[in-house]
A protein has these predicted regions:
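Helix-loop boundary and gating motifs at the non-cytosolic
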Residues: 1-45
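Hydrophobic core of transmembrane alpha-helices in multi-pass small-molecule transporters
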Residues: 3, 75-78, 88-106
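Short helix-kink/termination motifs in transmembrane helices of multi-pass secondary transporters
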Residues: 7-15, 63, 104, 108
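Residue-level signal for conserved functional micro-sites within the alpha-helical transmembrane segments
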Residues: 9, 43-51, 102, 106
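Helix-to-loop junctions at the C-terminal end of transmembrane segments
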Residues: 49-63
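Helix-breaking motifs and short loop linkers at transmembrane-helix boundaries and internal kinks
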Residues: 62, 84-89
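Structural signature of the two symmetry-related core transmembrane helices
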Residues: 66-81
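Cytoplasmic helix-loop-helix junction between adjacent transmembrane helices
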Residues: 96-131
Length: 132
């Protein structure tokens, strides 16, 4: 599960900078360095805010598996929309929505894994590292 969780992020994060700086004639967005940096800064902002908020929602109202699924769908839709956007402001909004949806799923994946380990009657300290 952790492999797939980080595979999602790595599948687009590695090439996003190149896509944003490539000229429009070559299929890119032709953003300058400051615009590219501001898009990448969204992940830091989202990672400070959203895990705590979604953690409260997960603890009180919605189970972690469902919430994680909904957030991954929101992220997928926002990335799909970002692929068709050429305007910087709209692209930044699409990436912000993606980051706001993706960042809490990192901690939710650990919650789901720990819950599965507990249900199986295993020890988290001893049995989680090999699973990871």
């Amino acid at each position: 599960m952790n492999f797939l969780q980080f595979f999602i992020w790595g599948s687009w994060l590695c090439t996003l900078g190149l896509y944003m700086t490539t000229p429009v004639e070559d299929g890119g967005l032709a953003f300058d360095g400051a615009l590219v940096g501001s898009v990448f800064a969204l992940s830091g902002i989202a990672s400070l805010i959203m895990p705590a908020l979604i953690g409260v929602v997960s603890d009180k109202w919605v189970n972690a598996e469902r919430l994680m699924g909904v957030l991954h769908w929101v992220g997928a839709i926002s990335l799909f929309c970002a692929a068709f956007v050429t305007d910087y402001d709209l692209f930044k909004i699409a990436m912000l929505v993606n980051m706001l949806a993706y960042m809490p799923t990192l901690s939710l994946s650990y919650t789901v894994a720990y819950n599965a380990i507990d249900k199986a009657g295993l020890d988290r300290i001893k049995d989680y590292p090999p699973v990871r």
